[in-house]
Regions:
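Positively charged, low-complexity intrinsically disordered leader regions
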Residues: 1-62, 66, 141
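Generic, ordered loop/turn and secondary-structure boundary motif
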Residues: 6, 11-17, 45, 84, ...
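Residue-level detector of flexible, active-site-proximal loop/helix-junction positions
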Residues: 17, 82, 140, 173, ...
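Alpha-helical scaffold segments in soluble metabolic enzymes
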Residues: 23-30, 97, 124, 148-155, ...
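Long, low-complexity, intrinsically disordered polar/charged segments
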Residues: 29-52, 102-104, 155-172
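Phosphate/diphosphate ligand-binding glycine-rich loop within oxidoreductases
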Residues: 42-154
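Glycine-rich phosphate/diphosphate-binding loop of Rossmann-like nucleotide-binding domains
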Residues: 54-66, 155-214
Length: 214
């Protein structure tokens, strides 16, 4: 099946089909193999990715910056402290202004005080921008980490990994942020036809919308 995702936001995996997710994985594996063989790419030459980290992350930041560099592009890091957000600029204005300079925008934002608030802000930014918006983790999903996890499953278990029984635990932790990782994995495995069992204790139930979708 031919897929065309040019200019499309990557905020929720619910906006994608299983074929589209598989295409993303196939392209990622191809680029990873070529990079391992020393091939150089300029697929994103003269392209700039803006990265808003309302909450910090070592791995997410390094992954995006390295990926942009390997593909010939450039990534810029922003926190709320070094943007006009600290002077009470709205998220809408922030997104509108940044879209005039950038080619894509990654946003990492979550707030456990009110579930869904981060996704509402993410959607506010999406509506204000004219460029693709990528979810680097909000309070509902972590789609990019999910795709990385799926790559690891295929690397370790082979191309027949979807026929394996996958068990994922979602449990107690000193640094619980959001249910974004298990909810994204739930959607991805459902779309790809994989068998996922999610184990969690009482009080860690997932969003009803995600359970219904899966």
């Amino acid at each position: 099946m031919r897929t065309d995702m040019r200019g499309k936001d990557f905020v929720t995996l619910m906006d994608y089909t299983g074929e589209e997710l598989q295409t993303i994985l196939d392209v990622a594996f191809d680029l990873k193999r070529q990079n391992a063989m020393g091939a150089e790419h300029e697929l994103l030459k003269n392209k700039t990715l803006g990265m808003i980290f309302a909450q910090p992350s070592t791995r997410t930041r390094v992954s995006f910056e390295t990926g942009m560099t390997q593909l010939g592009g450039h990534a810029q890091y922003y926190s709320e402290d070094n943007m006009q957000r600290k002077n009470k600029e709205t998220w809408e204005d922030t997104g509108l202004v940044l879209s005039r300079y950038l080619d894509a925008l990654m946003v990492r934002l979550y707030d456990l005080e009110k579930y869904g608030m981060a996704r509402d802000i993410m959607n506010e930014i999406r509506k204000a921008t004219t460029i693709p918006v990528i979810n680097g983790l909000d309070d509902k999903e972590h789609p990019c980490q999910c795709m990385g996890d799926l790559m690891t499953l295929q690397e370790k278990l082979g191309t027949g990994w979807k026929k394996k029984k996958i068990v994922m635990s979602w449990a107690y932790s000193d640094r619980v942020k959001s249910p974004g990782v298990p909810q994204a994995m739930l959607i991805a495995c459902s779309l790809l036809g994989a068998d996922l069992t999610l184990a969690y204790p009482k009080g860690y139930e997932l969003d009803d919308d995600y359970m219904a979708f899966a």
